[in-house]
């Protein structure tokens, strides 16, 4: 699948980095050292999650990004070592600087295949913004859900059938209009493409909201477990340790709730944007219908006029027509005779 993006399509998001949890035998001092941190990252969302981390065929790449500005094109891919493939459950998946530091890598971007997201390093992000670069991303996906959009309706893509070993190429759907000639030298585009009516970003926005809600639910469950442990013990040292752990978890909860609220705000903005896109598509469809209706009315009037003229000609009385023709011929002959005498 090939998706096209602009520099303005990159989101700035916050993620909570935390390993705060109950561990048997930990002291109050050790729990006090546990701290949730918020990292700011730069993210690109693909139109799908649960993408593939392996090539579908031996001849394609798992992930590649082509950056274009001016006459310059730069490639960032798994093959050239500039992009790492990670899971959203991997440590520091959303903190590329920390990931490179811990793993001894030097990636400029992380492809989180199961989340369908790309986290950019600061250098690559700065390059895209400074150059106002456009870029395209190629990736693979081999499992589709019933609710997933059909990629060939939105993107240039290649489909590979693992049974028949047949490869089908789908061109970029942009400009695939169906035009009908509705009158002399007048054509009308009758179709509205799905990509012009239904924005794919709404699906991914909902995925993100679902994920951050899950993060909040998870920390709430950890707090509830700690409260149960506090209620079931009479050891004052353990109560103090668990109290410190609970405080740390509550701090993490506040951070995650803050991020969840931001996600809700993004969601409302996205809903308004998608609604506006759909309204424009509906309005254009209505305008097409009105133009077609006007053309139909005009052609209907022309048909009526033509049929009336034809009827007048066909329904004329033969005797009257002969008399009229004879009179016209006599007048013509008299005119010729008079002209000849004058000359």
Enumerate the language-model features and the residues they cover.
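Extended beta-strand solenoid/passenger and fiber regions
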Residues: 2-101, 143-160
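Polar, low-complexity export/assembly segments characteristic of proteins
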Residues: 102-277, 281-284
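Generic detector of bulky aromatic hydrophobic side chains
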Residues: 42, 138-143, 155-156, 180, ...
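Amphipathic alpha-helical polymerization modules
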Residues: 1-2, 244-343
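Broad hydrophobic/π-residue packing in well-ordered secondary structure
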Residues: 19, 28, 120, 137-141, ...
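Acidic-enriched, low-complexity/disordered segments with a strong bias for Aspartate over Glutamate
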Residues: 9-11, 19, 24, 79, ...
């Amino acid at each position: 699948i090939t998706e096209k993006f602009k520099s303005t399509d990159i989101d700035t998001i916050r993620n909570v980095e935390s390993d705060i949890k109950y561990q048997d035998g930990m002291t109050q001092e050790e729990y006090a050292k546990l701290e949730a941190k918020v990292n700011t990252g730069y993210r690109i969302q693909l139109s799908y999650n649960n993408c593939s981390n392996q090539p579908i065929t031996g001849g394609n790449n798992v992930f590649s990004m082509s950056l274009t500005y001016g006459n310059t094109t730069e490639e960032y891919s798994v093959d050239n070592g500039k992009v790492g493939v990670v899971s959203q459950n991997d440590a520091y998946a959303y903190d590329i600087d920390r990931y490179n530091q811990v793993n001894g890598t030097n990636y400029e971007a992380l492809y989180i295949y199961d989340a369908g997201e790309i986290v950019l390093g600061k250098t690559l992000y700065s390059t895209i913004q400074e150059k106002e670069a456009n870029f395209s991303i190629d990736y693979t996906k081999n499992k589709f859900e019933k609710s997933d959009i059909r990629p060939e309706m939105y993107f240039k893509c290649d489909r590979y059938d693992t049974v028949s070993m047949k490869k089908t190429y789908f061109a970029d759907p942009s400009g695939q209009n169906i035009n009908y000639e509705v009158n002399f030298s007048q054509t009308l585009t009758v179709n509205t493409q799905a990509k012009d009516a239904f924005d794919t970003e709404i699906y991914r926005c909902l995925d993100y909201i679902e994920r951050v809600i899950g993060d909040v639910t998870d920390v709430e469950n950890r707090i509830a477990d700690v409260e149960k442990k506090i209620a079931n013990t009479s050891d004052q040292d353990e109560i103090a340790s668990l109290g410190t752990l609970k405080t740390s978890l509550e701090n993490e909860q506040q951070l995650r709730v803050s991020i969840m609220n931001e996600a809700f705000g993004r969601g409302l903005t996205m809903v308004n944007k998608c609604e506006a896109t759909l309204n424009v598509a509906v309005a254009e469809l209505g305008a097409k219908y009105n133009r077609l209706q006007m053309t139909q009315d005009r052609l209907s009037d022309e048909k009526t006029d033509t049929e009336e003229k034809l009827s007048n000609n066909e329904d004329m009385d033969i005797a009257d027509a002969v008399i009229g023709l004879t009179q016209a011929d006599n007048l013509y002959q008299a005119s010729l005779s008079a002209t000849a005498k004058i000359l």
